[in-house]
Amino acid sequence: MKFPGKRKSKHYFPVSARDPLLHQALPDSEVASSWIVGIDQTLVDIEAKVDDAFIARYGLSSGHSLVIEDDVAEALYKELEREGLITHQFAGGTIGNTMHNYSVLADDRSVLLGVMCSNVQIGGYAYRYLCNTSSRTDLNYLQGVDGAIGRCFTLIGEHGERTFAISPGMMNQLKPESIPEAVIAGASALVLTSYLVRCKAGEPMPEATMQAIAWAKKYNVPVVLTLGTKYVIGDNPQFWREFLQEHVSIVAMNEDEAEALTGLNDPLQASNMALDWVDLVLCTAGPNGLYMAGFTEEEGKRKTQHPLLPGAIPEFNQYEFSRAMRHQECQQPLRIFSHIAPYMGGPEKIMNTNGAGDGALAALLHDITANNYHRLNVPNSSKHGREYLTYSSLAQVCKYANRVSYQVLNQHSPRLTRGLPEREDSLEESYWER
């Protein structure tokens, strides 16, 4: 996808070299930069093949997910290492994945806040975390801890049955004073997950999260929340509705989380209801593709050239060619919606469903940051006659998010290894011209 942003070549989209505006653009060193910030429970996914006796020995229940104590996790990890049973160690965590994927797509800076072992052993899980994270993700603000970061063990039994053991370690020990005000002040977005505010009593992570939200509000930085799982939301949907209304500008969720939040099992209706609380909604709906919902200025609305779609809201995609705005920036807010079916019908064989939503969110964040970058560097462009949130229309953001999800579904890891090609060999030009 072509976006404004620093590139190896000197072309900026959509301005050509003959454009007089471009001559005012500053040399690279003086160009105003844009970045995003995310807070995560630093987590490593460790995959290992084990026998049934191993699972019984550690008191785990085959096929289920259990939280284990730190000493058990340490013993379990040591045995896996000693016996050479580990098949994969990946950096994980919803926000870590999103920051990494954003940096790969945008070839630009993201900042990750969280904890990291002060003492990193070469070849160990913390080392793997650092190795698996894009070099464009800034890890300089991580807070050191004397102990383990989070570990999620996926133990694959003799018959392929997966058993999960989760050890939080010290992943929730992020302190409010480790949240840098200046980094959040200059960011295009602050990205959070619902897990951050649900911790054991006495853990500082929720307080650190609220501190970050306070800085974001002070500097008018949009707060993005990804909903975690339907169980987290289903526990207390009212709490989350109020949380969204009070603190959040953009929500990302799947159809199950959307139902837990709103009580509606139609992703379109759920997205519409979520607009009562937030400015922009990204809702992935598995094999049904993805939905987006947002606001635009009544005067600036643009009609779609795509076929009008039926649904709970008839012809809901009528103005999907409009660009999204924050509700507070609209004089006469108009609700706009878009939907896209899975890219190329979805992959033939899904390698991994974990992370497709994080991939879609990274694409949306890339578009929002591109808009910010363009506003800072070409402020008198006609693109910025109004305070838009996205650079592209809702329909175009859907297309991009969809393409990135496909890429993640098609690989073993939830983290992209490379950016997307600007033009796809597999598609006729008409797909991109649409």
Named regions from a protein language model:
Residues 1-65, 86-90, 94, 115-347, ...:
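Ribokinase/PfkB-type carbohydrate-kinase core domain
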Residues 56-82:
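Active-site gating loops and adjacent loop-to-helix segments of metal-dependent hydrolytic enzymes
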Residues 68, 349-350:
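A structural signal for short, hydrophobic beta-strand segments that form beta-sheets
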Residues 75-86, 106-113:
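Glycine-/proline-rich flexible loop or hinge segments
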Residues 88-101, 350-360:
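Glycine/serine-rich anion-binding loops at beta->alpha junctions
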Residues 99-109, 156-157, 367-369:
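Alpha-helix C-terminal capping segments
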